[in-house]
Amino acid sequence: MAIIVVGGSSRGAGKTALICGLIAALPEFRWTAVKITTHDHGHAGSIFPGPIFEETLPGEETDTARYLAAGAARAFLATPAPRLHTDEPDLTAVLDELWPRFGRGTHFIFESNSVVHHVSPNVCLMVHAIAKRELPLPARKPSFFAALQHADALVAPSTRDKLVADGLCLAGQEPKPVFRLAALERLSPELLEWIRPRLGPAAHS
């Protein structure tokens, strides 16, 4: 099982576009893509009871439809309920419902900042709208800064593809790469070469 987590600095940062790029560039993994959101989209007809909806139609209308259009094997929208007496989403309950539905060889891409605290991904990519060589970054989601501590690399839109090998400098950590992409939907050769060895084989059970 390979797991990629893609988070972002804010809404509209390009998380979905990057996930579509990953799905298209790595089709042999037959990805199951899961968007985790705190917004109740109210989908009807879900094959799961509760907060998980499976998208079945590829298209451009929703993020999950875009996953399928990019080549994902399956796509889900997960809307976790808040934990009792708190406003924090109960990601543990959603994941506990999700995992048993799949074989051990299923490969997952998650779109979420918070899920990185609940899974052990092969790769965690954080998308930032403006590439910065060092912290502090501009004010962004608190969940972004928490997830950034787990990032293996930063991805940022740019006018051209460029790798900054030591571009992400976090206190107490070794410098990590920043991949600047001219189009988030199209992985640069450098990003593809960097990510493949971290995922392992794409065999399915």
Please tell me what each predicted stretch does:
Residues 73-104:
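Active-site rim loops that border cofactor/substrate pockets in soluble metabolic enzymes
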Residues 3, 31-33, 74-77, 124, ...:
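Conserved beta-strand scaffold positions in the cores of enzyme catalytic domains, especially
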Residues 23-85:
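N-terminal phosphate/diphosphate-binding loop that engages ATP/GTP or pyrophosphate donors
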Residues 4-22:
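Glycine-rich phosphate-binding P-loop
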